[in-house]
């Protein structure tokens, strides 16, 4: 997208219309592009066809929100953009990566795996997080322990508190991905 102005699909429509106005005999083939950030799922769905799936997940501050991902190739491939649940616009005025989480991204990944996706593409653009993916891993069943052997979900400000990681609870649905 063109951050806060137009999506790549909208830009394609505008450019196609203007080119056709100036060069009426031209054939315009518009191919939207994305960089992995906001709008990437819509571009994949426009180019490859497919289905948009909407679910409830956690936002960067662990509040409930509705976010979506795309399924293409008859559900075999899932396309997820971090921006849909952990994007910069969701940070609001706070914009503090020490307290944000990627937990919602993990929830999207798990949902896609549960629906049978074998390949999961995650676009990392426009993130307001800095938790090293620990929130995402937590949503997928990984446990993080602090020095008191208490489990917690790390964020950018608590990464240094990780003393032990237990992957034994990793979601079984991910085994075929």
What are these regions, as identified by a protein language model?
Residues 2-24, 83, 95-119:
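N-terminal glycine-/serine-/threonine-rich phosphate-binding loop
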Residues 7, 39-40, 155-156:
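Secondary-structure junction/capping motif
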Residues 99-103, 107-123, 128-176:
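Glycine/threonine-rich beta-strand-loop-alpha-helix active-site module
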Residues 15-92:
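Glycine-rich nucleotide/cofactor/substrate-binding loop typically near the N-terminus or early
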């Amino acid at each position: 997208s063109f951050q806060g102005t137009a999506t790549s699909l909208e830009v394609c429509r505008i450019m196609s219309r203007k080119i056709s106005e100036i060069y009426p005999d031209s054939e315009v083939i518009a191919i939207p592009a994305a960089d992995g950030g906001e709008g990437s799922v819509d571009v994949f769905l426009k180019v490859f066809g497919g289905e948009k799936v909407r679910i409830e997940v956690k936002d960067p501050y662990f509040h409930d929100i509705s976010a979506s991902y795309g399924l293409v190739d008859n559900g075999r491939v899932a396309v997820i953009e971090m921006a849909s649940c952990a994007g910069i616009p969701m940070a609001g005025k706070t914009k503090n990566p020490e307290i944000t989480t990627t937990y919602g991204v993990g929830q999207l990944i798990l949902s896609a795996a549960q629906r049978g996706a074998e390949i999961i593409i995650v676009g990392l653009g426009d993130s307001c997080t800095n938790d090293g993916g620990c929130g995402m891993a937590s949503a997928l069943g990984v446990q993080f322990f602090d020095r008191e052997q208490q489990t917690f979900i790390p964020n950018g400000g608590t990464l240094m508190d990780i003393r032990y990681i237990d992957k034994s609870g990793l979601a079984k649905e991910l085994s075929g991905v």
